[in-house]
Curated annotation (Swiss-Prot):
<comment type="similarity">
    <text>Belongs to the TrpA family.</text>
</comment>
<comment type="subunit">
    <text>Tetramer of two alpha and two beta chains.</text>
</comment>
<dbReference type="InterPro" id="IPR011060">
    <property type="entry name" value="RibuloseP-bd_barrel"/>
</dbReference>
<dbReference type="InterPro" id="IPR002028">
    <property type="entry name" value="Trp_synthase_suA"/>
</dbReference>
<keyword id="KW-0028">Amino-acid biosynthesis</keyword>
<keyword id="KW-0822">Tryptophan biosynthesis</keyword>
<protein>
    <recommendedName>
        <fullName>Tryptophan synthase alpha chain</fullName>
        <ecNumber>4.2.1.20</ecNumber>
    </recommendedName>
</protein>
<dbReference type="GO" id="GO:0004834">
    <property type="term" value="F:tryptophan synthase activity"/>
</dbReference>
<keyword id="KW-0456">Lyase</keyword>
<comment type="function">
    <text>The alpha subunit is responsible for the aldol cleavage of indoleglycerol phosphate to indole and glyceraldehyde 3-phosphate.</text>
</comment>
<comment type="pathway">
    <text>Amino-acid biosynthesis; L-tryptophan biosynthesis; L-tryptophan from chorismate: step 5/5.</text>
</comment>
<keyword id="KW-0057">Aromatic amino acid biosynthesis</keyword>
<feature type="active site" description="Proton acceptor">
    <location>
        <position position="49"/>
    </location>
</feature>
<dbReference type="InterPro" id="IPR013785">
    <property type="entry name" value="Aldolase_TIM"/>
</dbReference>
<dbReference type="GO" id="GO:0005829">
    <property type="term" value="C:cytosol"/>
</dbReference>
<dbReference type="InterPro" id="IPR018204">
    <property type="entry name" value="Trp_synthase_alpha_AS"/>
</dbReference>
<feature type="active site" description="Proton acceptor">
    <location>
        <position position="60"/>
    </location>
</feature>
Length: 275
């Protein structure tokens, strides 16, 4: 059983929903990022999605795209992102870490080398936005050999054939994209999302986690009624806007504190569902 699978099993036994924050590796500074990961866990994260900085992030909205630019400007590469995860693992051996990124940086490193680095660093899941499930079989198998889950996206516009392929190849959990568009998009129709999640649950036993458009405790709780977990990215990442790797430690700490305040709100809202 992988660390992701074990975490969801524990949450299910406790009748709890997974809170999964998304942060960009090395944003705003690689020096503060390990502390950020530990703080997210202290403030209720059940697992963490870590973005891999990339120069052409087609699915990222402006907030997350700017986070990637800040990380790249600070020198955070895919190799350094993995080194950060490895550093995090020195003190935390239980919180699952999922890498979310694009295919190009992985191909530059090489599939085998990338998977070996993930295993060595303690990565639990990989979500490659632009790797079609139909072309992922070999990659999925090689990840699985190291107890790493391959996560896939489903959205309101996913065609039936692709949906079937996702069900076949996905492990850990399914990331359901609640909105058409890019990360940080606006309105969230919780009833429509709920209907979609319930329909997906008829087709798979995998946990369903919903991301895109969750901004506060109210929207997290509304989605948490249907989903097994919620993923929150832009609402957290936006706190680092205007900062960089050259910013004062005090300014980064202030932004990080704002993120933790939001985490507390989200955690309390989700826990209230099982109270």
């Amino acid at each position: 059983m992988t660390r992701i699978e074990s975490t969801f099993e524990t949450l299910k036994a406790q009748n709890k929903k997974a809170l999964i924050p998304y942060v960009m590796a090395g944003d705003p500074s690689p020096n503060s990022f390990v502390d950020l990961l530990h703080d997210l866990v202290k403030h209720g994260a059940d697992m963490i999605e870590v973005g891999l900085p990339f120069s052409d992030p087609m699915a990222d909205g402006p907030t997350v795209a700017l986070a990637g630019e800040r990380a790249l400007a600070g020198g955070t590469s895919t190799h350094q992102a993995l080194a950060i995860v490895k550093k995090f693992r020195e003190q935390d051996s239980s919180t699952p870490i999922i890498l979310m990124g694009y295919l190009n940086p992985i191909e530059i490193i090489g599939y085998e080398a990338f998977i070996a680095l993930c295993h060595e660093s303690g990565v639990d899941g990989v979500l490659v936005v632009d790797l079609p499930p139909a072309e992922s079989g070999n990659f999925v198998e090689r990840l699985a050999a190291h107890d790493i889950n391959k996560i896939f996206l489903l959205s309101p516009t996913t065609l039936p054939e692709r949906r079937k392929q996702v069900m076949t190849h996905c492990g850990g959990y399914i990331y359901y994209v609640s909105l058409k568009g890019v990360t940080g998009s606006a309105s969230l129709d919780t009833q429509a999302v709920g209907e979609q999640v319930q329909a997906i649950k008829q087709e798979t036993n995998l946990p369903i986690c919903v991301g895109f458009g969750i901004r506060d405790g109210q929207s997290a709780a509304a989605i948490g009624q249907y989903a097994d977990g919620v993923i929150v990215g832009s609402e957290l990442v936006k706190n680092f806007s205007g900062l960089s790797h050259t910013s004062r430690a005090e300014d980064i700490a202030t932004a990080q504190a704002s993120i933790m305040t939001k985490m507390d709100e989200l955690r309390q809202a989700l826990d209230a569902l099982s109270a």
